[in-house]
């Protein structure tokens, strides 16, 4: 690499690294993901996202005003051709404590899922169960997963389009049995930034298609839709994510989230008009004799059109 290219590479890496660290720090602070004394189990798949998560968390560990442990964990699911030496060599170099778990979930998935069908759903459930159980064994107080902002938004639309639910991936989650807290430190990070970061850092990526599973076509379609929006309408994806953080149950239609049944008007409220009219002169009657016009100051006159049955 020439000196000029090397300088550009370093400049871009530093800029991107700063942004990602800031976003991860903000997500952790906003959702209180990591606390003093935590033992964080960082789940590694060998993909770009989990590598970036471990890298950023290790940097944060050195700079944060609190003390917490990091234990990297990878689950070898016995997929054909899985390069067993890559992750141990990488983690040894980092000098981070780690565990490589071995469990043949691949055979279970191949036995249960018909040939040519997507295996990702069952595979992820089996993987989650194994990792949750191991977290309890090692006394982990938090389980860190590498899902990013795009994953969260895609999941929202997948559940809307195909599940009839307004449901995404929360940045912080208590497992159904109450035994584990799952955190997603990359919740504010864009996938394209993580892709570039992985290239610049030259992480030893392990391909995710070793199982031979077909691509999840529904998720791929949603991803394509969002990418098209991002190209055509810059800022739309950011607005969607902001909207997900600003929900108003009373303005929706979900009876489980808001008690519409018990809504009662307050007969004692003064007749001052609706909040939307707060900036307009208040009035409490219509001057029928004057064709519906109410005589106010000329500069503030309001025309009120009324219809009356004969």
Curated annotation (Swiss-Prot):
Looking up InterPro entries in the UniProt record yields: Rossmann-like_a/b/a_fold, TilS/TtcA_N, tRNA_Cyd_32_2_STrfase, tRNA_thiolation_TtcA_Ctu1
Q: How is the cofactor bound?
A: Binds 1 [4Fe-4S] cluster per subunit. The cluster is chelated by three Cys residues, the fourth Fe has a free coordination site that may bind a sulfur atom transferred from the persulfide of IscS.
Q: Which domain of life is it from?
A: Bacteria
Biological processes, Gene Ontology terms: tRNA thio-modification
Q: What cofactor does its activity depend on?
A: Mg(2+); [4Fe-4S] cluster
Q: Does the keyword Cytoplasm apply?
A: yes
Q: Which GO terms describe its cellular component?
A: cytoplasm
Q: Where in the cell is it found?
A: Cytoplasm
Q: What does this protein do?
A: Catalyzes the ATP-dependent 2-thiolation of cytidine in position 32 of tRNA, to form 2-thiocytidine (s(2)C32). The sulfur atoms are provided by the cysteine/cysteine desulfurase (IscS) system.
Hey, which family's this protein in?
Belongs to the TtcA family.
In its miscellaneous comment, the UniProt entry states: The thiolation reaction likely consists of two steps: a first activation step by ATP to form an adenylated intermediate of the target base of tRNA, and a second nucleophilic substitution step of the sulfur (S) atom supplied by the hydrosulfide attached to the Fe-S cluster.
Q: How does it assemble?
A: Homodimer.
Its recorded name reads tRNA-cytidine(32) 2-sulfurtransferase
- Organism listed in the record: Shewanella sp. (strain W3-18-1)
The record's gene field reads ttcA
